[in-house]
Amino acid sequence: LCLRGTTDYWVNDALGQPFFCVERPVDHGLLEALRSDVVPRLLKEVPSQPTTEQLKADPYLSRFVIIFDREGYSPAFFREMWAEHRIACITYHKYPKENWPESEFSETQVTMSGGEVLSRKLAERGSWIGDRRDGLWVREVRKLTSSGHQTSLISTAYGQLALEDAGRLFSRWCQENFFRYM
């Protein structure tokens, strides 16, 4: 028995509601789907993007932010999105280095995309990811759990608060909940 296999990439808004879906009969992975299907469509359809003048006036302002899981981790891709489109990327750090001292973490109020405010122990640093050619500086935010585990996220949303980044990435679970109850 042979069946056609496809991969669906769901693009959701900040509240986890579906914006659109890309079906790929031949799939070469998330990064290729982002480059060829998702980003071109977002550039056309995302409302309220900054003007060219606004982007020129503020070197840290992004056109919009895309958030994805570890499969999309690629310093070269982050650099490409920022250089070519001024799109910021937020994802989990696939290769975090050693744990940070617990003294760097502070109890922080994080507003999730649905408006819920949660208390999290967070710390932030600038970090270099990738190699000399394709690497770049990113904002790294870590969440400290009660067990001492550190969850690391990285962001090229340079002009935003780390708390916003943390809330956005941690809210990504609303997508999984959407599919669970769909």
Label every PLM stretch briefly:
Residues 1, 16, 63-72, 89, ...:
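Short, conserved catalytic/metal-binding motifs centered on acidic residues
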Residues 14, 36, 40, 44-47, ...:
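Extended, regular secondary-structure scaffolds
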Residues 26-29, 71-75, 160:
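Short acidic, S/G/P-rich loop/turn micro-motifs used as interaction or catalytic elements
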Residues 2-56, 149-152:
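Electropositive, glycine- and tryptophan-enriched low-complexity nucleic-acid-binding patches
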Residues 26, 65-69, 166-170:
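Conserved aromatic-histidine-acidic binding/catalytic patches
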